[in-house]
Amino acid sequence: MNQERLMQVLLAPQISEKATYVADKYEQVIFRVASDATKPEIKAAVELLFKVEVEGVQVANVKGKVKRFKGATGRRKGWKKAYVSLKPGQEINFVEGGNA
């Protein structure tokens, strides 16, 4: 896999109450990823950027919500979410910027 492509796969960490719960209970980290990203690309990108070992990757396509603004109906953009399972003993800490 091209290293340039791997840098474009991960868009942002998904930081929310649910993401924190999943991280504590299941040792998983949630990322927003490119819509055309595959599981092997996501795994390689996380291992390259954060220097951790990945056990598995699950993905989910999130549909955009229908919203109204001043009477006009529009739709938010859909996106892809990746649940990355880390091997035991591995950790990614976004607050301190890097792995712990």
Curated annotation (Swiss-Prot):
A UniProt-annotated Pfam family: Ribosomal_L23
Q: Which branch of life, at top level?
A: Bacteria
Alphabetical list of Gene3D superfamilies matching this protein = 3.30.70.330
Which keywords annotate this record?
Ribonucleoprotein, Ribosomal protein, RNA-binding, rRNA-binding
An annotated GO cellular component? ribosome
Give a GO molecular function annotation for the protein: rRNA binding
Q: Does the keyword S-adenosyl-L-methionine apply?
A: no
Database matches in InterPro entries: Nucleotide-bd_a/b_plait_sf (IPR012677), Ribosomal_uL23-like (IPR013025), Ribosomal_uL23/eL15/eS24_sf (IPR012678)
Q: What GO terms describe the biological role, i.e. biological process, of this protein?
A: translation
Q: Briefly, what is this protein's role?
A: One of the early assembly proteins it binds 23S rRNA. One of the proteins that surrounds the polypeptide exit tunnel on the outside of the ribosome. Forms the main docking site for trigger factor binding to the ribosome.
Entry's family note: Belongs to the universal ribosomal protein uL23 family.
> How does this chain assemble?
Part of the 50S ribosomal subunit. Contacts protein L29, and trigger factor when it is bound to the ribosome.
Annotated protein name in UniProt: Large ribosomal subunit protein uL23
Species, as recorded: Dechloromonas aromatica (strain RCB)
